[in-house]
């Protein structure tokens, strides 16, 4: 019986390093460390109640959100896995108010790691897919970062990815040369390439939005969703299906595989806030991945990757997925603004 040749994450990254000359060794090693941390998080997620990791931790993060035990554990895993490797100048996490400088007793590198350690954590206790989102930037200030060092537009990302902890654990990755998906082989402990050069279909008949907030939406979103709900009898002359998991990684992963549009708009309840999702930890890495897969991502008015962050925890509205639908809802926003 012939041995089946499979491409592991390590092999894929080494081949990219050789073929494109566009993947520095330090960046390759950093991605591998993040992937190992995601394996550890996946293990704790899969233990569920058996690992005493369910439930709340009795604390809030900088966003004012109640932290789950797994939120805190996942954050610690990512920090501890990456602080000593010598590839990073600093890290920033959705769960921490300030950025995390690399301790003085460890070597430092030229990259910055930004992450949401456990996206969709409201779903932990009900066993719905959750995940980790991460982004890598170069540190413009050498090895002594300040908060300003992190405040770079998404176009400056050198890598981004997410892991989904679901029926399978998968890692989706881009280094600016397309999007690939790796599945965790638990028997071997390796990430194995299972989807290459992922592409989002341009046309779609699915959309993801929290429809319970409809009464709070601004007119452009109400107009767009109204057209989708009207189906064949309306101006779009086609039926659309709504899918909403309330876990960004799960919703985006579905869209990456079969098309669709994900929307988390600003609304009238908090008119002083431009949205709910975090630009640095969620919107930028997902926008990078989606664009690399042929999709589009905007805040309703401009490309997400072009937004200049003003703070580590800045929030934005998000519309991403199949290009034609993102372009349409963005056009409605711009027409309303005229």
From Swiss-Prot:
Gene3D superfamilies the UniProt entry points to: 3.40.190.80, Fructose-1,6-Bisphosphatase, subunit A, domain 1 (3.30.540.10)
Residues the entry annotates as binding substrate: 119-122, 210, 276
Cofactor: Mg(2+)
Record flagged with keyword Magnesium: yes
CDD domains: FBPase
Binding site for Mg(2+) 1: 94, 116, 118
EC numbers, comma separated: 3.1.3.11
Cofactor note: Binds 2 magnesium ions per subunit.
GO biological process, one term: fructose metabolic process
Top-rank taxon, per record: Bacteria
Transmembrane segments: none
Residues the record lists as binding Mg(2+) 2: 116, 119, 282
Pathway listed: Carbohydrate biosynthesis; gluconeogenesis
Major enzyme class: hydrolase
Keyword Metal-binding tagged: yes
This protein's UniProt keywords: Carbohydrate metabolism, Cytoplasm, Hydrolase, Magnesium, Metal-binding
Any one GO CC term of the record: cytosol
SUPFAM superfamilies the UniProt entry points to: Carbohydrate phosphatase
Entry's localization field: Cytoplasm
A Pfam family matched in the record: FBPase_C
HAMAP family with a match to the protein in the record: FBPase_class1
Family: Belongs to the FBPase class 1 family.
The name this protein goes by in its record: Fructose-1,6-bisphosphatase class 1 1
Organism: Paraburkholderia xenovorans (strain LB400)
